[in-house]
Amino acid sequence: MINIRKTHPLMKILNDAFIDLPTPSNISSWWNFGSLLGLCLIMQILTGLFLAMHYTPDTSTAFSSVAHICRDVNYGWFIRYLHANGASMFFICLYAHIGRGLYYGSYMFQETWNIGVLLLLTVMATAFVGYVLPWGQMSFWGATVITNLLSAIPYIGTTLVEWIWGGFSVDKATLTRFFAFHFILPFIITALAAVHLLFLHETGSNNPTGIPSNMDMIPFHPYYTIKDILGALFLILTLLALTLFTPDLLGDPDNYTPANPLSTPAHIKPEWYFLFAYAILRSIPNKLGGVLALLLSILILIFIPMLQTSKQRSMMFRPFSQLLFWTLIADLLTLTWIGGQPVEHPYIIVGQLASILYFLLILVLMPTVSLIENKLLKW
């Protein structure tokens, strides 16, 4: 009798994606992050669902409803901190996944890469509107500052901001619609992730060498299912350690103060995973220029495949490109640190230099060094 998993219309899809999928035999642990992102998404949707059962999206009760979840709901504090720290784990996996793609040339799968960039933008939007929901000081002022950036758009800016706010300031209407967005976006992310996977399975996975691996494939199950389970255990262990020992390590103490439109916090800053982009935004003294730089810092990923000048796909055998890649990582860490610092000397100049270096590395230095490496191959 033929196996049902190969004939049943639904099972066949799952079988071709997770069981009998031909996979390169040499993909490293950097290829674990895709499945970890799927796990993060499932955890966020589940914890978020249980939080939504007790949360009220109203300016007068939002803050106290979060306090009620933490104090009165059975294991409410646990669900709340799993959700908050789950977002941090999500972004750690996301950045590792993108870094892997950059290092090993996975961006040459253009459809997969472009949907990935779209996924990144959607996840960032979800995290931003989600941060507003507890209605603490940083929630309110973060929402005010970031939505206000849209007023830099010529002619329609102010109208656009007031349209998003649903009034003349961040208020009840804003909170309600942000809750609606925060509820719907994860399902859009799930659909996009399925399309991301669909396009990936059209070409098959890349591998560390960047060389086609069609002649050496192994089935996804059991080899990579067991490898993914190991990665998942590490992820869950880290998340539980963070949630149970230091739940507020990555949060902002200002968010334990209820939102007050009459009192501005000393330092308005987003969650840690947006700090690099925030630093780039702040490093330009012009409002419109800053907004454009902020947008470009993320959208630059779309242009990566066009900037490929190397004859080799992966950086595995390109030491000079490797050096620039790790310089880029160090630069992003510097920007993340600067984004959390006050706007004063010497942080301003360091932020400006790091921002210039970020764009210079991606747009100029890496393509140039790739060309030099091509020449060196002929020696």
Curated annotation (Swiss-Prot):
Binding site for a ubiquinone: 201
Gene3D superfamilies registered for this protein in UniProt: Cytochrome Bc1 Complex, Chain C (1.20.810.10)
Necessary cofactors: heme b
Gene Ontology biological process terms from the UniProt entry: mitochondrial electron transport, ubiquinol to cytochrome c
Residues at which heme b b562 binds: 83, 182
Domain of life: Eukaryota
Transmembrane segments annotated in the record for this chain: 33-53, 77-98, 113-133, 178-198, 226-246, 288-308, 320-340, 347-367
UniProt-annotated location(s): Mitochondrion inner membrane
Record-listed heme b b566 binding positions: 97, 196
Cofactor note: Binds 2 heme b groups non-covalently.
Entry membrane topology: Multi-pass membrane protein
SUPFAM superfamilies assigned to the protein according to its UniProt record, in alphabetical order: a domain/subunit of cytochrome bc1 complex (Ubiquinol-cytochrome c reductase) (SSF81648), Transmembrane di-heme cytochromes (SSF81342)
Disulphide linkage map: none
GO CC annotations on file: mitochondrial inner membrane; respiratory chain complex III
Keywords, alphabetical: Electron transport, Heme, Iron, Membrane, Metal-binding, Mitochondrion, Mitochondrion inner membrane, Respiratory chain, Transmembrane, Transmembrane helix, Transport, Ubiquinone
Pfam families membership: Cytochrom_B_C, Cytochrome_B
Entry GO MF terms: metal ion binding; ubiquinol-cytochrome-c reductase activity
Oligomer status and interactors: The cytochrome bc1 complex contains 11 subunits: 3 respiratory subunits (MT-CYB, CYC1 and UQCRFS1), 2 core proteins (UQCRC1 and UQCRC2) and 6 low-molecular weight proteins (UQCRH/QCR6, UQCRB/QCR7, UQCRQ/QCR8, UQCR10/QCR9, UQCR11/QCR10 and a cleavage product of UQCRFS1). This cytochrome bc1 complex then forms a dimer.
Miscellaneous information on this protein: Heme 1 (or BL or b562) is low-potential and absorbs at about 562 nm, and heme 2 (or BH or b566) is high-potential and absorbs at about 566 nm.
Entry similarity comment: Belongs to the cytochrome b family.
Function field: Component of the ubiquinol-cytochrome c reductase complex (complex III or cytochrome b-c1 complex) that is part of the mitochondrial respiratory chain. The b-c1 complex mediates electron transfer from ubiquinol to cytochrome c. Contributes to the generation of a proton gradient across the mitochondrial membrane that is then used for ATP synthesis.
Protein name per UniProt: Cytochrome b
Gene name of this polypeptide: MT-CYB
